[in-house]
């Protein structure tokens, strides 16, 4: 960055070329051993074109530039990603592994759940009266079964049950409450979390505008459009913490030009957006993107007109 301080403003390909390919050119000779680069959640990276561009570049680092790199890429098998891997350039240098039940994910999920609940108990001294280990093994068995091999299900449960300001036993009871109308256990979990949303603000509106505007570093834009007070969005999103990523800094704050500012967290998993966009799955929590795009346009023009009038 000292040699090229404007690098962060360049295209992704220029950045990758500079930071990876050009960097290896300074090494002579090249290392004899290969280095492993792990890329998880490729399907959640920006947009389809970007994802395919990343795969093309990674392929060229091996086939064209002959760099001593190996990649472990984790992704949902979206059609455009499968198409990229089916192209000859990638097909001949890759190996595919389907993470199905043969890998026994339930065993790892069980360990994850037991460890997560143990940490919740250690953090909440009020739970010391409960018989340990808490919860009982039968509940762990049920949660492992419901997870269907999906770690996101188990991770969301641990975040939901262990959320601050809530009673873990009550939160767990909500998770265990059956919903015969849910299409899947993950959908049921998402619906349950949104159903107990603690704020009086319309949760669907908040989610709809966050997805539509897509400006994580400008929460005040969403606050203006929703008519919120400054800082209110941060408070509102705390009620959705189990569905959001944990930021590097506490409460999603970041240092921006020497000033601590709030950054809207990303959703923890792409499956949550899939749930919101499908009305048959999310029901009353359905987010109609076209509707919110129209609302953003109308409300933005309204705010602009209000600002113009205030200048007169």
Which residues make up each language-model segment?
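Conserved NB-ARC/NACHT P-loop NTPase core of NLR-like innate immune receptors
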Residues: 1-305, 312
């Amino acid at each position: 960055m000292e040699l090229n301080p404007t690098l962060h403003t360049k295209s992704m390909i220029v950045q990758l070329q500079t930071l990876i390919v050009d960097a290896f050119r300074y090494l002579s000779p090249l290392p004899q051993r290969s280095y492993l680069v792990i890329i998880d959640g490729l399907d959640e990276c920006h947009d389809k074109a970007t994802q395919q561009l990343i795969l093309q570049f990674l392929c060229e680092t091996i086939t064209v530039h002959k760099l001593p790199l190996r990649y472990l890429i984790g992704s949902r098998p979206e059609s455009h990603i499968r198409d990229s891997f089916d192209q000859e350039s990638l097909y001949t240098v890759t190996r595919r592994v389907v993470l199905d039940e043969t890998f026994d994910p339930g065993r790892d999920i069980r360990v994850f759940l037991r460890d997560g609940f143990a940490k919740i108990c250690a953090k909440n001294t009020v739970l010391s009266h409960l018989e340990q280990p808490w919860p009982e093994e039968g509940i762990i068995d049920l949660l492992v079964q419901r997870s269907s091999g999906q770690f996101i299900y188990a991770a969301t449960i641990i975040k939901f049950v262990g959320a601050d300001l809530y009673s873990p036993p009550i939160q767990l009871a909500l998770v265990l409450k059956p919903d015969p109308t849910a299409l899947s256990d993950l959908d049921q979990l998402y619906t349950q979390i949104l159903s107990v949303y603690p704020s009086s603000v319309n949760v669907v509106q908040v989610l709809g505008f966050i997805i539509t505007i897509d400006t994580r570093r400008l929460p005040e834009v969403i606050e203006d459009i929703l008519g919120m007070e400054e800082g209110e969005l941060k408070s509102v999103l705390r009620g959705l913490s189990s569905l959001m990523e944990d930021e590097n800094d506490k409460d999603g704050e970041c240092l921006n030009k020497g000033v601590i500012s709030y950054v809207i967290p990303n959703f923890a998993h792409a499956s949550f957006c899939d749930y919101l966009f499908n009305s048959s799955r999310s029901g009353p929590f359905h987010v109609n993107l076209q509707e919110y795009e129209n609302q953003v346009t109308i409300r933005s023009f309204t705010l602009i007109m209000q600002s113009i009038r205030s200048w007169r």
